[in-house]
Amino acid sequence: MDSPVSKTDASKEKFVASRPSTADSKTMRGCGLANLAWVGVDKVELRQRLMMPEYLRLAMRDCIKRKDSSAIPDHLLLPGGAVADMAPHAPMVVFINPNSGGRHGPVLKERLQQLMSEEQVFDLTEVKPHEFVRYGLGCLEKVAAEGDECAKECRARLRIMVAGGDGTVGWVLGCLGELNKDGKSQIPPVGVIPLGTGNDLSRSFGWGGSFPFAWRSAVKRTLHRASMGPVARLDSWKILVSMPSGEVVDPPYSLKPAEENELDQGLDAGIDAPPLAKAYEGVFYNYLSIGMDAQVAYGFHHLRNTKPYLAQGPISNKIIYSSFGCSQGWFCTPCVNDPGLRGLRNIMKIHIKKVNCSQWEEIAVPKNVRSIVALNLHSYGSGSHPWGNLKPDYLEKRGFVEAHCDDGLIEIFGFKQGWHASFVMAELISAKHIAQAAAVRFELRGGDWRDAFLQMDGEPWKQPMSTEYSTFVEIKKVPYQSLMINNE
């Protein structure tokens, strides 16, 4: 039987699959961005291109320290405002997670401060992204409102780089998303210096999967590319977990108690909904998964948090991770157990909404699928493409469209067990395709299972289940899109 995956050149297919669909992501191809790795970048010219005038840098620094966007000393305000040509071509700030990237974190911070300025590099252990958005950008906007053309241009041209992993990038994107809620139209685009483990957000927008060995020269090239790279769009997805009265034990950072239970009433859940429900909400940019993969991740994270001395490097991490997979039956289910009994169809129902459709539609949970993933990006699990690059005739047959990270659709697929997942991640076969959807609702009901395991962008948690009432996990697109700098 023919594979649904296209058999054209693999390297070419990976490149196409990871490219956002926006037209402006293609406009810089002729500008030589792909060859910038071989072009020397002058340090002085780069500094002039990125560094904001001193009076603006100091004003923003003071406002952030005082947590007051109006605390601008008079001596830092230029009489009559500044002329527009004082604004740099691409004013930039960098957020760095010093705990990422091993020993590179602190020295990278120092290198960035040398290339730009100390005031434009923010240590995330000292300045949080929401503080910069509220007080730093707020300061810039207040100075611009006083007639300062330089401040106005800096605010309009501002770009942000994040040195960290996917979790750090998502943190910054989430804080910038608050500008949309406040009705702000100028949202700074974000680029990535990959310091994490998976770095799937970084891979998806051309910033690579790891920090380069020759990092000193690479930092200059990266900042130069970020100053001129095209802007692409990225969907983000809101998750709402509605459960019987109780609490999630040790919820991840990205999952917060919801003020209101805003479960979509378009699908009648009255029979199975508890009289008093507890709700949690969060936002993800890459994926949400339910099942054995999340259970293995939860066990590994719990061990790493309680016994960090056992997980001190990538090799030991992989050994421990694999042992968890085997001990919990992900790779080797005990013979006394029927693998089908561990299938998610025993505890789960799935409903989806298709594009431009207000009605929920129930879809079947495939037999023996033990992990289900709702994926936004093409890159998953450190650069794999589990959805695959599907042939046009297969797309038409299944009613799918080519997947992009800005198309308002999320891809849903399943893994049967660890070996199946391993072959999928090696791109030898495709995952079990289930659906493409504009909204998803998972309904979980415990039987012999007391808990389900979920993870969102790499953060796992244990989700208690009831045998009497259902737990609902609803995914909907966030109304606004994030802006990313595309290093194509």
Swiss-Prot record:
Enzyme Commission number(s) of this protein: 2.7.1.107
The DAGKc domain, residue ranges: 87-245
Pfam (any one): DAGK_acc
Alphabetical GO biological process terms: defense response; phospholipase C-activating G protein-coupled receptor signaling pathway
Coiled-coil annotated spans: none
Domain of life of the source: Eukaryota
Protein name: Diacylglycerol kinase 3
Gene: DGK3
